[in-house]
Amino acid sequence: TAAAVGAVGVLRHDPMAMKPFIGYNVGDYWAHWLEMGEKLGDKAPKIFNVNWFKQDEEGHFMWPGFGDNMRVLDWIIKRCEGTIDAEETAIGYLPKKGDINLEGIEDEVTPEILDKLLYVDKDLWKKEIAEMRRYYKEDISDKGGHIPAALIAQLDKLEERLNR
């Protein structure tokens, strides 16, 4: 939206794409959603992280995008239904090789490209954790806000898994 315009190429922390519309302490906002998740229990929506824009060494997008995104969404739906397994990693569950339908795009998404798409770059994730800690401190805590302890605990657990 026009309300969310920012500098191009600069990481913008925007919780749930709601930053322009959160009219109170973001820590309270997060706490509300954490509480909602607890109330919903097993009925809470599953959360998935997808990077449609991962690039190779030459700056080319590795995933074809557009309608082919449905191939990943199909895997997500199957995970939600409990009809397909996943590989547990430090950052969560990833598709097992062969579980994303690549029929018809084998020339675009080769086994080597798929390996790169599913690769967990621990150093990159550790940098992300450091950036999140900086964001929590400088952009929220130092400005009078607060962070729910559960979010800090999740960062700590993620960092611990990455260090194994």
Q: Predicted regions span which residues?
A:
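Conserved NTP phosphate-binding and transfer environment spanning the P-loop NTPase/kinase superfamily
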Residues: 1-164
